[in-house]
Regions:
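Metal-ion/cofactor- or nucleotide/acyl-coenzyme-handling active-site neighborhoods
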Residues: 1-277
Length: 277
């Protein structure tokens, strides 16, 4: 856990944009609490709080035991009594007109209850999909896949009850930090709103539960809109959007307007700033 002075509440929100790839995040530990998103836990020391909003990631994180080590905020994480297990599973399938799922992911026996409570979610892709090959060419394919994700709840987990604003993971982490930590300052690191290349911008692209490294950049207008809502709803908090540098790369573009409680700084400026505090 962090070694920071709790009398001054500083939060670092860590996104998974590629701008943070070579930035040593361990330098932040003594200066504030670290809120991170999704697969951050895979290759970094555990943050103080982990946020995930997609069922593929929430169940991965739970199955890895992370939710028993640190507080985790998961979307659609409703714990159901075990007698509902088969009924809920069949309900997911019947809504898709299927007798059997295409993939079932669980941390226990797929047929028998192994605990008092469980969380179950489904993910369906149905219709015509555009498939991108590694050489950049594409082709059309009809798909109809239903994946079901299940987690048997084990004692001592730190999943949280919370008010979900419905944002993507980054802005959701910002919302949670402001609501429950009452911070003085919030720093956005690796929260890239654009891509410097013609490809998807994410450190974990191409890995399990992430889009292919060959995908086009994600449309990000909704991300910007969500962050602006976080700024406006927390006027008393000073926000810093930490870019890798101040050059003209797309990831360094000042896309979040000129909100009075928002300032743009570089990673180098962040380190200088923390030395003074």
């Amino acid at each position: 856990m962090s070694e920071y002075n709790a009398s001054y509440r500083r939060i670092f929100i860590i996104g998974n944009g590629e701008s943070r790839k070579d930035f040593d995040l361990t330098q932040l530990r003594k200066h504030g609490k670290i809120y991170a998103c999704n697969a951050y836990y895979r290759d970094n020391p555990l943050p103080d709080v982990l946020v995930a909003v997609d069922s593929t990631m929430t169940h991965e994180i739970y199955h890895k035991g992370i939710a028993h080590k640190i507080p985790c905020y998961f979307r659609e994480w409703t714990k159901c009594p075990n007698f509902m297990y088969q009924t809920m599973k069949q309900g997911f399938l019947s809504t898709q007109g299927k007798d059997k799922e295409d993939k079932f992911v669980t941390n226990g026996d797929s047929a028998l209850p192994i605990g008092d409570y469980f969380v179950m979610n489904s993910h369906t892709i149905k219709g015509e999909a555009t498939i991108r090959r590694e050489d950049g060419t594409t082709y059309k394919k009809m798909v109809d896949n239903t994946h079901i994700y299940n987690s048997w709840i084990t004692p001592g987990d730190k999943t949280q009850e919370w008010e979900d604003p419905g944002y993507h993971a980054g802005a959701t982490a910002g919302h949670i930090a402001c609501k429950y930590e009452n911070p003085n300052e919030v720093y956005l690191i690796g929260m890239d709103l654009r891509s410097d290349t013609k490809y998807y911008n994410n450190i974990y692209k191409g890995s399990k539960h992430y889009s292919s490294a060959h995908y086009e950049p994600s449309p990000t207008g909704i991300w910007e809109s969500e962050w602006l809502q976080v700024f406006k709803h927390n006027r008393w908090v000073k926000f810093y959007k930490v870019n890798k540098s101040d050059d003209d790369k797309l990831t360094n573009t000042k896309l979040l307007g000129d909100e009075q409680n928002l300032e743009y700084i570089t990673q180098a400026q962040l380190l200088d700033l923390l030395k003074q505090k």
